[in-house]
Amino acid sequence: MFTYVGLIKLTSEGREHLEKAPEYLEKVKGIVELEGGILEKTYAVMGPYDFLAIVKYPDTETAFRVLAKIAKLEVLHTETFPAEEVDVFLKALV
């Protein structure tokens, strides 16, 4: 499984119905799990984003498929980045 970090912003529609944020996040979790991914952690954050998610997918194709399905919800925008532990990065330097 490969790790991805997702930075999530609610859309104007998502902010308009902020009380439904738990429902939106459950839908996202359901989509991730249905496609074989694992939503490891979700954090509420301060700043330009509303949430940060740590997600594992079996491959990049699955990540793309999940992100396309999430985009269809039209209540949040995501920016997603592949991530690796620092030790792996440091080993790649030598």
Task: Name each model-derived stretch.
Residues 1, 38, 55-57:
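A generic hydrophobic-segment detector
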Residues 8, 16, 44, 79, ...:
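Flexible, active-site-adjacent loop/turn segments at secondary-structure boundaries
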Residues 1-33, 90-94:
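Short S/T/G/P-rich N-terminal loop/turn motif that feeds into the first structured element of a domain
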